[in-house]
């Protein structure tokens, strides 16, 4: 447990940052989930619209260090790949 006043302050700051970062990570997951739901409905336009909303949020969180930049790139790439697969007619 923190004993000095500065250590107590740092512990308080760390807890505040942790909870704020957790809410931001949750927000990113929600945006990603919305895109995945739109993809699952096989609606390319709706999925694209959700993707367009999600990309700046994902990028912003990667810039702030909330999620790793490679993880952000991976999410964007996979979501975009699924959306493109919806747009291309299935080979019969």
UniProtKB/Swiss-Prot annotation:
What GO molecular function terms would the record report? small ribosomal subunit rRNA binding; structural constituent of ribosome
Q: Matching InterPro entries, A to Z?
A: Ribosomal_bS20 (IPR002583), Ribosomal_bS20_sf (IPR036510)
Q: Where is the composition biased (Basic residues)?
A: 7-20
Output one GO BP term.
translation
Region spans: Disordered: 1-23
Q: Name one GO cellular component term.
A: small ribosomal subunit
Keywords for the protein's UniProt record, in alphabetical order:
Ribonucleoprotein, Ribosomal protein, RNA-binding, rRNA-binding
HAMAP family from the UniProt entry: Ribosomal_bS20
- Which family does the similarity line name? Belongs to the bacterial ribosomal protein bS20 family.
Record's function text: Binds directly to 16S ribosomal RNA.
> Under which name does UniProt file this protein?
Small ribosomal subunit protein bS20
């Amino acid at each position: 447990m923190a004993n000095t006043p500065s250590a107590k302050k740092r512990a308080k700051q760390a807890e505040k940052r942790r909870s704020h970062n957790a809410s931001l990570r949750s927000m990113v997951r929600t945006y990603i989930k919305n895109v995945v739901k739109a993809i699952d409905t096989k609606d390319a336009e709706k999925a694209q619209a959700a993707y367009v909303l999600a990309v700046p949020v994902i990028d912003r969180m990667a810039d702030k260090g909330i999620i790793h930049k490679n993880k952000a790139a991976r999410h964007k790439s996979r979501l975009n790949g699924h959306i493109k697969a919806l747009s291309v007619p299935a080979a019969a």
